[in-house]
């Protein structure tokens, strides 16, 4: 029974680590998308 609990805890730690990495990557992509949009808008509307 204790061995099963250890495996569950390991799996849970792995899952929570994956979730935190996914959240971090989503935040980075959001920032990059915002920056790219801003730069495109400045490039398009900069001549006016």
Curated annotation (Swiss-Prot):
The chain crosses the membrane at residues 25-42. It is a single-pass membrane protein. GO terms for biological process: negative regulation of cell population proliferation; shoot system development. Keywords: Cell membrane, Developmental protein, Membrane, Transmembrane, Transmembrane helix. Belongs to the DVL/RTFL small polypeptides family. GO terms for cellular component: plasma membrane. This is Small polypeptide DEVIL 19. Pfam families: DVL. Small polypeptide acting as a regulatory molecule which coordinates cellular responses required for differentiation, growth and development, probably by restricting polar cell proliferation in lateral organs and coordinating socket cell recruitment and differentiation at trichome sites.
């Amino acid at each position: 029974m204790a061995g099963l609990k250890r495996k569950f805890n390991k799996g849970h730690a792995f899952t929570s680590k994956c979730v935190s990495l996914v959240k971090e990557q989503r935040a980075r992509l959001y920032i990059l998308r915002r920056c790219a949009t801003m730069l495109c808008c400045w490039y398009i509307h900069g001549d006016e």
